[in-house]
UniProtKB/Swiss-Prot annotation:
It catalyses: (2S,3S)-3-methyl-L-aspartate = mesaconate + NH4(+). It comes from Carboxydothermus hydrogenoformans (strain ATCC BAA-161 / DSM 6008 / Z-2901). Keywords: Lyase, Magnesium, Metal-binding. It holds the Pfam family MAAL_C. Pathway: Amino-acid degradation; L-glutamate degradation via mesaconate pathway; acetate and pyruvate from L-glutamate: step 2/4. Its EC number is 4.3.1.2. Belongs to the methylaspartate ammonia-lyase family. GO terms for molecular function: metal ion binding; methylaspartate ammonia-lyase activity. This is Methylaspartate ammonia-lyase 2. The active site is at K331 (proton acceptor). The record marks H195 as: Transition state stabilizer. GO terms for biological process: glutamate catabolic process via L-citramalate.
């Protein structure tokens, strides 16, 4: 089955592009807006609409394969590729990429993904991560349609993985609405919750960590109030390095605080994402490796999750090699081609470290659906409900696609 045409259209994501540098320097909120001047090249405002480019591959039989190019909320910052806008990148797709797609035989996802993710260059440079992300999604969908298979089945077959028609735990994020959205997550029986966005010491963590401790107390009580004794979600809190700030990155003290949180969270399993941010890749790897060692030695029932400085496939491999944490987040758009997402999950599992197939609130419904198929094939420990920050919408998109795929896999005899 060949591609006979390729179409591209501007789209919207589930959230916004935010200039992280300007926000760190004290940009002031005005409603949902930020006042002030952008600090990162490419930004015209501190907060801009989240943009996507919608990829449509027309196949010989008239079917259309879909994928969406998208970037993370903090596009253009933290060493990432430049800010991703449709205006800038649509011409590249139309003029440089479209001719290379037309006439391609859709016979192997891995081979095609390798070409567009790792070999193809424009003006001597690799394609933007967002372009590689969306193009490889569409290519996977195209191969699946050509073979009359689910995308999960294509990944399983090409990477020699078993087809297991069972759900992968879904992790929801509350955003700043810590209480109402936690209620929503509990009512809908989310597998992992609430993320909680603990990104500020004064407002959210507390100078002694007392505000987060109080929130976990409230959350545990609320789970029992709304759901009774049968519901046992994992409590997963992202602290954005703030715990390290209040303890001056003293790992023994941090471990002691995490032990207090774990005691309060019991009987629920506790994960803490990003306990420290050491400001560099190797500093982060060393700190999380030591912190994991302390936690394991002391028998503290908490798992730490690597996020900061763990961005590319190469980064993820380094964190896994050095056991820098109990789990690594795989931020799907930052990896470029979804072939790298598959490799990242499989590498983490091979190394005995937890795999969290994450991403960003700033993706699309389509990229989230395709992430579901990657998760069903590779079996990470959890995946993110995305896109958006409203909780309900992202959970609906991911949960429903997962249930559809599982039902079809069962019908086809997946075991």
């Amino acid at each position: 089955m060949k591609i006979i045409d390729a179409l591209f259209a501007p789209g919207l994501t589930g959230f916004y592009f935010d200039d992280q540098e300007a926000i760190k320097k004290g940009a002031v909120h005005n409603g949902f807006w930020y006042e002030g001047n952008p600090q990162t090249p490419g930004y015209k405002r501190i907060r801009q609409k989240g943009e996507a480019i919608l990829v449509m591959l027309v196949l010989e039989n008239g079917e259309v394969a879909y994928g969406d190019c998208a970037a993370v909320q903090y596009s253009g910052t933290g060493g990432r590729d430049p800010l991703f806008t449709a205006e800038e990148f649509l011409p590249i797709l139309e003029n440089e990429i479209r001719p290379k797609l037309i006439g391609l035989e859709l016979n192997s996802f891995r081979n095609l993904a390798h070409i567009f993710d790792r070999e193809l260059t424009v003006n001597g440079k690799p394609l933007h991560t967002a372009l590689r992300y969306g193009l490889t999604q569409a290519l996977l969908d195209g191969v699946a349609r050509a073979q009359k298979k689910l995308m999960a089945e294509v990944i399983a077959e090409e990477y020699q993985l078993p087809v297991i028609p069972e759900p992968v735990p879904i992790f929801v994020q509350t955003g700043d609405d810590l209480y109402t959205n936690a209620d929503k997550a509990i009512i809908k029986r989310a597998d992992v919750l609430p993320h909680a966005l603990i990104n500020n010491v004064e407002e959210k963590l507390g100078r002694q960590g007392e505000k987060l401790l109080a929130y976990i107390k409230w959350l545990k009580k609320r789970i029992f109030e709304l759901a009774g004794d049968e519901y046992r979600p994992v409590i997963h809190i992202d602290v954005y390095g703030t715990v390290g700030l209040i303890f001056a990155n003293d790992l023994e003290k941090i471990a002691g605080y995490l032990a207090t949180l774990a005691h309060e969270a019991a009987p629920f399993k506790l994960r803490i994402e990003g306990p420290v941010d050491m400001g560099s890749l190797w500093g982060q790897i060393e700190a999380l490796s030591k912190l994991r060692e302390i936690i394991d030695r002391r028998g503290i029932p908490v798992e730490i999750v690597a996020d900061e400085w763990c961005n590319t496939l190469e980064d993820i491999k380094l964190f896994a090699d050095h056991k820098a944490g109990h789990m690594v987040q795989i931020k799907t758009p930052d990896l470029g081609g979804i072939n790298n997402v598959v490799e990242a999950v499989l590498y983490a599992k091979m190394k005995g470290i937890g795999a969290y197939l994450g991403g960003t609130c700033n993706e699309t419904d389509r990229s989230a659906q395709i992430s579901v198929h990657l998760a069903l094939a590779t079996r990470p420990d959890q995946m993110l409900a995305k896109p958006g920050m409203g909780l309900d919408e992202g959970l609906m998109i991911v949960y429903n696609e997962m249930q559809r795929a599982i039902a079809l896999l069962k019908r086809r005899g997946g075991k």
